[in-house]
Amino acid sequence: MKYDEIMVRYGELSTKGHNKKSFIDRLGSNVRKALHQYDQVKIHPNQDRLHVELNGTDAEPVMERLKQVFGIQNFSPSLRVEKDFDSVVEAAVAIFKEQVQGPTTFKVETKRADHKFPMGTFEMNKQLGGALLKAFPTDLSVDVHHPDITLRVEIRLNGIYLTSAKILGAGGLPVGTAGKGMMMLSGGIDSPVAAYLALKRGVSLEMVHFYSPPYTSEQALAKAKELTGKLAKYSGSIKFIQVPFTEIQETVKEKVPEGYLMTVQRRLMLRLACALAQKRAGLAVFNGESLGQVASQTMESMLAIEDVTTMPVLRPVLSYDKNEIIKIAEDIDTYDLSILPYEDCCTVFTPPSPKTKPNLKRARSYEARLDVEGLMQRALDGIEITEIHAGDEFLNQNQDVFAELL
């Protein structure tokens, strides 16, 4: 069926009071960004909902993109007809012909924004329902409480719109309404899921990835970039900041006792992420830590690591177990990429028995053996920033290079 418009309903935006307009404006901007390749599509954000005018564009690919825009509770493809009852009946019958396959219950719900239209909502419900029963005498029956099909009719100034579908959106808040944060992105399963959940709460993210050549490979770096491409479909594009970490890891290994390697290393990672946040107008640092999952994610470890900053360190998957995280990773299509066996810097130089309850004073004293300021400055001087868009691929490019070398 050739639809004329998609009616988008807001989620939590309806609770935002005086701030609602700024949330709606941001959602409108995000929808325009998501649909930028469809030149004929027009976006009209209003107080109660957002209207996507298709102007001949196929609704299916547009709806697939809308499913990935946070801040949308649900949406409905709709037909527009002229403001006369016969046209409404004709469109309603066409909609039902596609959906009625045997005995089916239905009801009609009408909203009238144009109060000059001669037919009231109750009369429209009654007359249109009767016309549909006449058109499908053996299959249709009315059920106003739990119908199989709800036909929604909106009488507006520019026409009458009909829809019977309600498609679930991504929920959450529009990306950009909750401020900006730095996401510490490894190549594992947890941090992409944490990034997804942060985006869903309206946070605009930049990815911070630590890489340690030659201990980590080009494939590991490419994997992290491609994971960012998977996440970019929810926010339009994401800046990927790669931070050279080899010198820091080698120095920590040389000067810090084995049991505290991981703690001091992660203190330096957090220092760098916070420095980037301060430099790039970020308000918080996000990571993929899940309480108790590994040695560095005990509360004692978190205390010893987070000691280096006063900036909020937020952990969206803190209370999730591994199976819950994996389920989300599968749903957002990052799982298969995350489990590719390319070692990242978080697993380089991992001691066999890291401290699960590191002592804060000892962590500070071991870190004091390092030229922290110099190490950080050299790492920050060596960063590279890439803007990554939805669907960008990096692993295949690297595989082609390796194939040529072979």
Curated annotation (Swiss-Prot):
Which SMART domains does the UniProt entry name for this protein? THUMP
Q: What is its EC number?
A: 2.8.1.4
**Amino acids binding ATP:** 184-185, 209-210, 266, 288, 297
State if Amino-acid biosynthesis is listed as a keyword: no
GO cellular component assignments: cytosol
Top enzyme category: transferase
Superkingdom of the source species: Bacteria
Listed pathway(s): Cofactor biosynthesis; thiamine diphosphate biosynthesis
Q: Which UniProt keywords apply?
A: ATP-binding, Cytoplasm, Nucleotide-binding, RNA-binding, Thiamine biosynthesis, Transferase, tRNA-binding
Role played: Catalyzes the ATP-dependent transfer of a sulfur to tRNA to produce 4-thiouridine in position 8 of tRNAs, which functions as a near-UV photosensor. Also catalyzes the transfer of sulfur to the sulfur carrier protein ThiS, forming ThiS-thiocarboxylate. This is a step in the synthesis of thiazole, in the thiamine biosynthesis pathway. The sulfur is donated as persulfide by IscS.
What HAMAP family is this protein classified in? ThiI
**PANTHER family per UniProt:** TRNA SULFURTRANSFERASE
According to UniProt, the name of this protein is: Probable tRNA sulfurtransferase
Name the species this protein comes from: Limosilactobacillus fermentum (strain NBRC 3956 / LMG 18251) (Lactobacillus fermentum)
